[in-house]
Amino acid sequence: MVVNNPNNWHWVDKNCIGWAKEYFKQKLVGVEAGSVKDKKYAKIKSVSSIEGDCEVNQRKGKVISLFDLKITVLIEGHVDSKDGSALPFEGSINVPEVAFDSEASSYQFDISIFKETSELSEAKPLIRSELLPKLRQIFQQFGKDLLATHGNDIQVPESQVKSNYTRGNQKSSFTEIKDSASKPKKNALPSSTSTSAPVSSTNKVPQNGSGNSTSIYLEPTFNVPSSELYETFLDKQRILAWTRSAQFFNSGPKLETKEKFELFGGNVISELVSCEKDKKLVFHWKLKDWSAPFNSTIEMTFHESQEFHETKLQVKWTGIPVGEEDRVRANFEEYYVRSIKLTFGFGAVL
C-alpha cells in the first residue's frame, strides 16, 4: 500500500477484514477442550462466519485499530453415555461482539448443541470451563497482532518524518505494538501490503460481480419436528401462507430442484438448488434490486431434538453483496422466521 501523507499528519486507514478472517481460521480451528480420549471432549471444527469491520488507522503518527466483529464457529466432540459408549455431537458457538475495546471478561458466548439431549448437554460445562477461556485469549491478542502486522503499511517511514510531534507518536506507537504483539510463529500469517485496500465506505449495493461478497450465519429454533419445518419451505400452499405473496412457474404442489420462484411481490427471486429430505435445503436467493451477477446461496440444515421437541435451523448464507448483510439478516428474521412462527404456531415470537 503506497502512502502519500507528509509527516503522517492526515488520517489514513486500511481495510483488514480479509486478513482477520484468515487469522481467526488459523488461530481458532483445532482449539480443544479436554483430550479426545477423555469422557468429555470438544474442539472447534471450523469458522463458519465472520461479519463486521476491521481496520487499522493512523493520524498525526498515532496508529490504532478499529474492529467490531461477529464470529460463529462450529464445534464437535463427544460425551460418554450411561452405558459407557461415546456419544458424538456437533454444535456452534456464536460470539456477537469481538471489538477493539472489548475486555477479556466482556465477551458473550452463545453455545448451541445440535440435536441436543440431556446427555449431550453435559458437554456445555466443559466448553465453558476449558474452551471459552482459550477463545478469550485469542480475541484479546488479535488487536495487538493486527497492529503489528499492518501498522507499518499506513505510515511514511520514521526517517522521512520531519515533525517531532508525529515522529514521537509514531515511535511510541510501535514501541507499544512490539511489546504487546505475540512472538512470530512458523506458520504466522504473512504481512502483505498489497492484499488489503484502503477503506471505502458506502451503503450502495456493488454494481459488479467482482467478488465483493460476504456471508452470514443464523440459527433460529422452531418448536416443531424437522419434517414439518422442511415441508414449510417446499409446500407451495404453506409458502403462500407465510409469505402472503408468492409466484410459482411450475404447477406441482411442491417446489422441485432447479425450480425458480418469486416471493413477497417479486422482491425476492429464488431457486431450489438441492434437497435432502428432512435434513437439508439449498436455495439461490437474491433481492430484486441486486445487480445481475449477484446471487447468494442459502444452505439450510435441520437439526431435530426429539427430547426437547424442537428443531434448530442452521443457516449458512454466502455470496451476499458487501453492505447488504444487515438488510438480509433482518429480512430473514422478520419475513421468514417470525412469519413462519406466527402463521403455523412453530414457536414463541419475541
From Swiss-Prot:
<feature type="compositionally biased region" description="Polar residues">
    <location>
        <begin position="203"/>
        <end position="212"/>
    </location>
</feature>
<dbReference type="GO" id="GO:0005829">
    <property type="term" value="C:cytosol"/>
</dbReference>
<comment type="subunit">
    <text>Monomer. Interacts with HSP82.</text>
</comment>
<dbReference type="InterPro" id="IPR013538">
    <property type="entry name" value="ASHA1/2-like_C"/>
</dbReference>
<feature type="compositionally biased region" description="Low complexity">
    <location>
        <begin position="190"/>
        <end position="202"/>
    </location>
</feature>
<dbReference type="InterPro" id="IPR036338">
    <property type="entry name" value="Aha1"/>
</dbReference>
<keyword id="KW-0143">Chaperone</keyword>
<protein>
    <recommendedName>
        <fullName>Hsp90 co-chaperone AHA1</fullName>
    </recommendedName>
</protein>
<feature type="compositionally biased region" description="Polar residues">
    <location>
        <begin position="158"/>
        <end position="175"/>
    </location>
</feature>
<keyword id="KW-0963">Cytoplasm</keyword>
<dbReference type="InterPro" id="IPR015310">
    <property type="entry name" value="AHSA1-like_N"/>
</dbReference>
<dbReference type="GO" id="GO:0005634">
    <property type="term" value="C:nucleus"/>
</dbReference>
<dbReference type="Pfam" id="PF09229">
    <property type="entry name" value="Aha1_N"/>
</dbReference>
<keyword id="KW-0346">Stress response</keyword>
<comment type="function">
    <text>Co-chaperone that binds to the molecular chaperone HSP82 and stimulates its ATPase activity. Binding to HSP82 promotes a conformational switch in the catalytic loop of HSP82, facilitating the interaction of the catalytic 'Arg-380' with ATP in the N-terminal nucleotide-binding domain. Although not essential, it confers thermotolerance when intracellular levels of HSP82 are limiting.</text>
</comment>
<dbReference type="Pfam" id="PF08327">
    <property type="entry name" value="AHSA1"/>
</dbReference>
<dbReference type="GO" id="GO:0005737">
    <property type="term" value="C:cytoplasm"/>
</dbReference>
<comment type="similarity">
    <text>Belongs to the AHA1 family.</text>
</comment>
<dbReference type="GO" id="GO:0006606">
    <property type="term" value="P:protein import into nucleus"/>
</dbReference>
<dbReference type="GO" id="GO:0001671">
    <property type="term" value="F:ATPase activator activity"/>
</dbReference>
<dbReference type="InterPro" id="IPR023393">
    <property type="entry name" value="START-like_dom_sf"/>
</dbReference>
<dbReference type="GO" id="GO:0051087">
    <property type="term" value="F:protein-folding chaperone binding"/>
</dbReference>
<dbReference type="GO" id="GO:0006457">
    <property type="term" value="P:protein folding"/>
</dbReference>
<feature type="region of interest" description="Disordered">
    <location>
        <begin position="158"/>
        <end position="212"/>
    </location>
</feature>
